[in-house]
């Protein structure tokens, strides 16, 4: 359930229906939002993913829209797929961002670093979320929101799931040592990242990790481990104007 709520923050936000959309794949979004800084530099692996999969939005982009990507090795691929599948999606490079003022932006996720990047490229600031909006987004992306909402999702005895917000090292220690196994999470982190699996012992390493996370993000989220059958998430689409609809399921396939 925590993942379900958290993934709502992956929603694509529109700022006007008449304008053409520029889609941006920025998989480092969660880490950038967690850092809260405008000059965030993603790890090399995340930057490589963003480059390799820059055209990913072409598969869900609206007709007549564009995808931000380097042209050197993406143009031919996009041209071939567009002709084969009758896709009306264009490629836009970074230097071209400043050329069009009549467009809206639809990234994988908003964060202060992306906002600054687009402003540096000459994007119309009126089409970008404000700095205040970024602060609100960071607050609502915090897993503390999921901790608060989770009890309301347990509609009857067939529902389970608990999540705890731990503010101090003493609370973290008591949570870990009071359970045979449990999971600690950084309140702001990417899917599958910022996790610490614990086996009933509050080690020096775990203590140090909790201290660092709490210092930068306000606390640590603790969750019990269940004898689960399947891992999946429910994904939602938010239109930016208060409407949220169920978009589908995301099922995880792992080697475990």
Regions found by a protein language model. Name each.
Residues 12-15, 46-62, 68-174:
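Conserved N-proximal alpha/beta basic substrate-recognition cap immediately N-terminal to
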Residues 19, 24-25, 31-58:
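N-terminal-proximal low-complexity accessory segments that begin disordered
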Residues 132-142, 222-226, 235-238:
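Core catalytic machinery and nucleic-acid-binding channels of phosphodiester-processing enzymes
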Residues 156-161, 183, 198-227:
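Conserved ATP-binding module of the ATP-grasp superfamily
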Residues 162-163, 182-206, 233, 256:
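Glycine-rich phosphate-binding loop of ATP-grasp-fold ATP-dependent ligases
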Residues 227-256:
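Phosphate-binding core of ATP-grasp and ATP-grasp-like enzymes
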